[in-house]
A protein has these predicted regions:
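Alpha-helical transmembrane segments in multi-pass membrane proteins
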Residues: 1-49, 218
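Membrane-interface capping segments at transmembrane-helix boundaries
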Residues: 49-54, 229-242
């Protein structure tokens, strides 16, 4: 979603980047746009919610080691399970599979790609969609309404049905994490974990050429979804909310 936001805002505000054509943007340009957007939205977050000084400081005691492990594992499992469900639907001919991470990795320098995908994009997206959108809805409504609506907004911004489906599921999990710990850095870490695993998988090619039957897709998806229950309970026990 961050790339769609970059194109919308970047074309309007920074037409000089790479001649103003977003299709020609390099990874360096995307990173510069990430930084520009982070600088733009941090003051908006502070002005809207006026967090107490030091309240967003990164401290392991906010989650505990087990809570942080559950957060990363739950985020990755959620993303992978939805990804497998999408691939299964593609096998059945519902829609084509779209791998945005692989496209970006092929597009330029690996180090810059990783910096953009694993570091900048999660920070930017969580600041906007959990820090601003979800928290704004949450200030006037209940958790589930806010989580569903903010995840739907995140999905629409992707401008792609396949990525949008994943965004809804992952967005709900990240909203749950944010609601539980009340610290924005925790969903940022969870999002970074998802992108790091996806990047490592695509770059290493460890899963390329792997073919399994429909039955095993279903079994793996069911097992992953079942594993989310104890993981979410573990997160809830170590958090301050829910």
């Amino acid at each position: 979603a961050v790339y769609e936001l970059q194109k919308i805002i970047g074309t309007a505000l920074f037409p000089v980047f790479d001649g103003g054509k977003t299709s020609d943007w390099s990874n360096t340009t995307y990173i510069l746009m990430d930084i520009a957007m982070i600088i733009l939205f941090i003051p908006a977050y502070i002005l809207l919610f006026r967090p107490e000084r030091g309240s967003e400081r990164i401290r392991l005691r906010d989650t505990g080691g087990m809570g942080l492990l559950c957060t990363a594992a739950g985020a990755v499992i959620t993303s992978v399970a939805i990804g497998l469900a999408i691939k299964l639907a593609a096998i059945w001919g519902a829609f084509p599979v779209f791998d945005n991470v692989e496209i970006i990795l092929k597009d330029g320098n690996l180090l810059l790609s990783v910096l953009s995908i694993v570091i900048c994009a999660p920070l930017m997206e969580e600041l906007v969609f959990r820090g601003l959108v979800f928290k704004s809805f949450r200030s006037v409504s209940g958790f589930w309404f806010s989580a569903i609506l903010s995840s739907a907004v995140w999905a629409v911004i992707h401008l792609n049905l396949v990525q949008g489906i994943r965004a809804v599921g992952v967005g709900l999990f990240l909203a749950f994490v944010y609601e539980t710990y009340q610290k924005l850095w925790v969903p940022v870490f969870a999002h970074m974990s998802i992108n790091a695993v996806a990047t490592a998988s695509d770059y290493s090619g460890v899963l390329k050429g792997l073919h399994i039957g429909t039955f095993w897709y279903i079994i793996i998806i069911v097992l992953m979804l079942a594993a989310l229950y104890p993981i979410c309970r573990g997160i809830a026990k170590t958090g301050t909310r829910l």
